Amino acid sequence: ILGPVLSLVGNALGGLLKNE
């Protein structure tokens, strides 16, 4: 269950960091 959640969170955080 945590797998997909962590993946989505990681993608969101990665996108924000890459945006800056």
UniProtKB/Swiss-Prot annotation:
It is found in: Secreted. It comes from the Eukaryota. One of its GO terms (cellular component) is extracellular region. The keyword Cell inner membrane does not apply. The keyword Lipid metabolism does not apply. Keywords: Amphibian defense peptide, Antibiotic, Antimicrobial, Secreted. Signal peptide: none annotated. GO terms for biological process: defense response to bacterium. Has antimicrobial activity. This is Maximin-Hu. It comes from Bombina maxima.
